[in-house]
Curated annotation (Swiss-Prot):
Record's subunit section: Part of the ribosomal stalk of the 50S ribosomal subunit. Interacts with L10 and the large rRNA to form the base of the stalk. L10 forms an elongated spine to which L12 dimers bind in a sequential fashion forming a multimeric L10(L12)X complex.
Disulfide cross-links: none
Molecular function terms, GO-annotated: large ribosomal subunit rRNA binding; structural constituent of ribosome
Pfam families registered for this protein in UniProt: Ribosomal_L11 (PF00298), Ribosomal_L11_N (PF03946)
CDD domains on file: Ribosomal_L11
GO CC annotation terms, alphabetical: large ribosomal subunit
Family: Belongs to the universal ribosomal protein uL11 family.
Role summary: Forms part of the ribosomal stalk which helps the ribosome interact with GTP-bound translation factors.
Signal peptide: none
Keywords (A to Z) from UniProt: Ribonucleoprotein, Ribosomal protein, RNA-binding, rRNA-binding
Protein name: Large ribosomal subunit protein uL11
C-alpha cells in the first residue's frame, strides 16, 4: 500500500521538526534522509513555502514531488515584500513590471488548469488585486480589462 504525506515546507530549509518529523516518523522512514532530499529538491525556492508530497511505498522507499509555491509567495519574492496590503483596493504595497508578471505566470502555468498564458496572467492579476499590488502603475482590474479588450498583448509561448 502506498501512503502520501503532503506538507508545506520552507524552500531549502526543511527540518526534522514539525510539520515534517511528526508526519513521516510513524511511517518508519529515516527522517534525516527525507529532509535532505526535500532540501535538495526545494533549494531553488529558498525563502518561500513550498508544497511537497512524500510518496511512501510498502518497502519504505519514498519519492518526493515538489509543487509550485502559491502565487502570493512568488509575488512577494519578486517584490521583496513581507506581506500584501491589509486593506487591498485602498492600499498599494508594491508595483510589478509587466516582465515580472509574465515570469510569475510562466512559473505558475505548469500547475494551472488554464490553456493559455493570457489566462494564467489573469489568474495572477486576481492575486495581485487581493494583495494590493499594481502592475506598471495600473490596477490589476484595469489591466485585466485592457487585456480582454486587446489593448495589452500577452505573448503566447
Amino acid at each position: 500500500m502506498v501512503q502520501v504525506v503532503e506538507v508545506l515546507v520552507p524552500g531549502g530549509q526543511a527540518s526534522p521538526g514539525p510539520p515534517l518529523g511528526p508526519a513521516i516518523g510513524p511511517l518508519g522512514l529515516n527522517v534525516k534522509q527525507v529532509v535532505d532530499k526535500i532540501n535538495e529538491a526545494t533549494k531553488d525556492y529558498e525563502g518561500l513555502s513550498v508544497p511537497v508530497k512524500i510518496i511512501v511505498k510498502d518497502d519504505r522507499s519514498f519519492e518526493i514531488e515538489v509543487g509550485i509555491p502559491p502565487v502570493s509567495a512568488l509575488i512577494k519574492r519578486e517584490l521583496g515584500i513581507e506581506k500584501g496590503a491589509s486593506n487591498p483596493g485602498r492600499e498599494v504595497v508594491g508595483n510589478l513590471t509587466m516582465e515580472q508578471l509574465l515570469n510569475i505566470a510562466r512559473i505558475k502555468r505548469q500547475q494551472s488548469l488554464s490553456y493559455t498564458l493570457k489566462e494564467v496572467v489573469k489568474e495572477v492579476l486576481g492575486t495581485c488585486n487581493s494583495m494590493g499590488i499594481t502592475v506598471e502603475g495600473k490596477s490589476p482590474k484595469e489591466l485585466t480589462r485592457m487585456i480582454e479588450e486587446g489593448q495589452v498583448e500577452i505573448p503566447e509561448e
